[in-house]
């Protein structure tokens, strides 16, 4: 329901695309049970990201869970976070950039791994590194990072990544990132 449609090319993720709203969006929670586990976890990362950028209730609910199961109210709140941000900034002028949290580093991870790492896993890694940068540059409390890492450990998601490319190539990839 974000209206952003894109595809990858040799320069990176979502380099070609449009902003076009769908006529409708259907949410069928029962389909979540049919997803492979890694894709389900990718969705969990999207939810925790929404909690970190705009809804503390989602974040607190996610980090206190002891299972993968997420109640529908939290999913609905995650959808509402995205709808609110997109409705306020459809063409990604300013506020919508919040939804890119974790994506700058995440896109580097995806490209560097030749897309062998799922988008959600890459964003999870990206969030981790962007939190570390926020701690270093802005004084983000370590407790937020610890809570996030605890959650990633609970869902058995890796959060560290050893880049295969050298720093010059990574910088070149960053120059082509859509953001």
Predicted segments — roles?
Residues 1-64:
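A glycine/threonine-rich phosphate-anchoring loop and its flanking beta-alpha core
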Residues 44-48, 74-82, 127, 152, ...:
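Short alpha-helical scaffolding segments that buttress acidic/His motifs in well-ordered protein cores
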Residues 45-47, 139-179:
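C-terminal charged capping/lid subdomain of soluble metabolic enzymes
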Residues 48-55, 66, 82, 89, ...:
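Structural signal for hydrophobic packing residues in well-ordered secondary-structure cores
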Residues 64-116:
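Oxyanion-binding "anion nests"
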Residues 73, 77, 100, 104, ...:
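Amphipathic alpha-helical interaction segments
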Residues 100, 104-144:
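Internal helical hairpin/lid segments
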